[in-house]
C-alpha cells in the first residue's frame, strides 16, 4: 500500500470516527427535556460505576446522609457492567439492590448513559417507587436533559455522551483543550452552546471523568468515583442549595 493510500484511509477512518462520536451534534438532535420545577437542595453526581451496590462507596453514603438532599440526580454511569436491554421489572430489581442503602432519599432522577455501562431502556422515561425508610420515587431517563430551578437560577444536567459518545475520547478532547489552549471544560462549553442554554444558567455534566467548576461560564463536571487508566477517581459531587452550587470532595 502506497503512502498516499495509507494517508487517505487513515483520514477516512478518523472522519468516520468523529462523525459517529458527534453524530447528535451534526444532525442537530435535541435530547429529551425533563423539568423538575423548583428545588431548594439537590445533589448531582455521576460516573459512580457500581458493580453490585452503592455500599461499595461508603464515604458517599455518609456524605449523602449528612447533606440530606430533597432530590438526588445521577448524571449517568451509575453502573459498570449493565449495558444491556432491560425491561421494567429487571430495571426495578437492580435499582432496588443497588440503592437500598440510601432508601431514605425521597426522590432520585437517574439519567442513563446511551452508549455504555447503563441499562438500555425501551422508552424515554420510566417511573417507579421503591419501599424503604420512606417511599423512594425513581425516575429513569434515557439519556435525557434535566432542568430545574433553585432560588431563581436555572440548572441543566446531562451525562455528556449525547455530545460525544465515547467517554475516553471526550476526556481526551477536554485534556487537549486544557493543555494546548488553556480551555478547561471544553466539551461542557460546547454542550451549553449546542443546547442553546441561557448564558446565566448552569450546565452540569459527567462522562469525561475530569472534574471542574467554572463560575464565570457556569459550567461544572461532577468527576467520577472509579479510577481508570485515563483518570483517577475524584470522589466528588455537586450540592446545590438555594441556587448556589458547591463541588464537594470526599476521600474514597
Regions found by a protein language model. Give the residues of each.
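Acidic, histidine-bearing metal-coordination/catalytic regions of metal-dependent phosphoesterases
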Residues: 1-41, 251-252
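Catalytic core of the metallo-beta-lactamase
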Residues: 26-32, 52, 151, 157-163
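Conserved beta-sheet core of the metallophosphoesterase superfamily
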Residues: 128-137, 151-155, 161, 167, ...
Amino acid at each position: 500500500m502506497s503512502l498516499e493510500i495509507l494517508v487517505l484511509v487513515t483520514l477516512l477512518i478518523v472522519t468516520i470516527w468523529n462523525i459517529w462520536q458527534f453524530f447528535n451534534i451534526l444532525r442537530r438532535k435535541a435530547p429529551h427535556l425533563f423539568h423538575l420545577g423548583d428545588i431548594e437542595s439537590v445533589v448531582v453526581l455521576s460516573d459512580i460505576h457500581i458493580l453490585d451496590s452503592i455500599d461499595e462507596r461508603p464515604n458517599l453514603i455518609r456524605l449523602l446522609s449528612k447533606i440530606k438532599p430533597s432530590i438526588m440526580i445521577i448524571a449517568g454511569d451509575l453502573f459498570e457492567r449493565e449495558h444491556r436491554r432491560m425491561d421494567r421489572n429487571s430495571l426495578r430489581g437492580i435499582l432496588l439492590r443497588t440503592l437500598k442503602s440510601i432508601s431514605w432519599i425521597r426522590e432520585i432522577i437517574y439519567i442513563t448513559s446511551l452508549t455504555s455501562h447503563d441499562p438500555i431502556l425501551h422508552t424515554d422515561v420510566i417511573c417507579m417507587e421503591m419501599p424503604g425508610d420512606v417511599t423512594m420515587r425513581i425516575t429513569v431517563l434515557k439519556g435525557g436533559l434535566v432542568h430545574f430551578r433553585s432560588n431563581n437560577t436555572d440548572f441543566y444536567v446531562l451525562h455528556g455522551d449525547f455530545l460525544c459518545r465515547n467517554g475516553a475520547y471526550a476526556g481526551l478532547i477536554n485534556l487537549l483543550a486544557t493543555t494546548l489552549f488553556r480551555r478547561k471544560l471544553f466539551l461542557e462549553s460546547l454542550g451549553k452552546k449546542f443546547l442553546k442554554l441561557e448564558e446565566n444558567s448552569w450546565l452540569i455534566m459527567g462522562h469525561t471523568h475530569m472534574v471542574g467548576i467554572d463560575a464565570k461560564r457556569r459550567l461544572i463536571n461532577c468527576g467520577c468515583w472509579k479510577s481508570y487508566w485515563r483518570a483517577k477517581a475524584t470522589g466528588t459531587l455537586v450540592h446545590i442549595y438555594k441556587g448556589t452550587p458547591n463541588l464537594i470532595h470526599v476521600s474514597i
